[in-house]
């Protein structure tokens, strides 16, 4: 109701725990964001921030509002400083659901990123995109495969200092094209393939060997086009003699082009 004592009681007993702002002069989230020493003192005990401002902060000239990004947030986990791949403010803005799960506490947010976010290849800094890093460096893919944490830690420990690019690569470089000793490069382009069939990533992930395996073992039977250079439907329709040889065995058309067709000058796809 309207009773001022009851409203004040509600604010103190419940509203502060929900970090409600009850004055234009004081925003508890801003106060928490600006002062790292207060975060260490009060953590998730929101009442502490209000009480500190009332007792000491205002008189000392501390800012009660105006801070929209956390200052001095924690970046060290397990003895390793993740500052080159982790920005608290960037992270919670990109993944607001993290705050819903663990709250604003900067140590808890960092813990979540390291323990769960990295495995989901979440980007926590404008400076580092794990997908880009994986795409650009084939040697790192061989070393870390689907262990996403490896890419972050490599950049933290060696990559940044070594001048490696943390962002900017939108297509995989140096991807695998050999399966069972046959090089499918003339009918297979990793980047073309995942762009055309994004559901493949949902099934096998970004690993270039796994994507190639999927293409050869399942995609060819579905006559999927994995390169601008080769359209299996066009190749089949343009070469009646091959239809007699391979019929509905779609892999035959791909393999024919790889082994003989391209070298013989046969056209693999309709010219654009």
Named regions from a protein language model:
Residues 1-272:
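Charge-rich, low-complexity intrinsically disordered regions
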């Amino acid at each position: 109701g309207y009773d001022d004592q009851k409203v004040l009681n509600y604010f103190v007993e419940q509203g502060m725990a929900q970090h409600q702002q009850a004055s234009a002069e004081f925003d508890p989230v801003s106060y928490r964001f600006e002062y790292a020493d207060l975060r260490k003192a009060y953590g998730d005990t929101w009442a502490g921030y209000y009480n500190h401002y009332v007792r000491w902060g205002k008189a000392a000239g501390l800012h009660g509002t105006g801070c929209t990004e956390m200052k001095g947030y924690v970046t060290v986990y397990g003895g390793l400083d993740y500052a080159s791949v982790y920005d608290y403010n960037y992270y919670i803005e990109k993944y607001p659901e993290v705050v819903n799960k663990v709250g604003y506490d900067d140590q808890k947010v960092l813990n979540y990123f390291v323990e769960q976010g990295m495995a989901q290849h979440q980007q926590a800094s404008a400076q580092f995109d794990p997908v880009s890093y994986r795409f650009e460096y084939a040697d790192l893919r061989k070393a870390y495969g689907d262990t996403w944490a490896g890419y972050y830690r490599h950049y933290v420990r060696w990559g940044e200092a070594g001048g490696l690019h943390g962002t900017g690569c939108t297509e995989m470089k140096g991807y695998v094209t050999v399966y069972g000793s046959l090089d499918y490069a003339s009918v297979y382009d990793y980047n073309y393939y995942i762009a055309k069939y994004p559901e493949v990533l949902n099934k096998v992930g970004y690993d270039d060997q796994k994507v190639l395996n999927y293409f050869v073992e399942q995609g060819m039977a579905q006559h999927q086009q994995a390169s601008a250079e080769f359209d299996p439907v066009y190749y089949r329709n343009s070469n009646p003699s091959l239809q007699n040889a391979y019929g509905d065995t779609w892999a035959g058309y791909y393999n024919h082009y790889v082994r003989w067709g391209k070298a013989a000058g046969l056209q693999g796809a309709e010219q654009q």
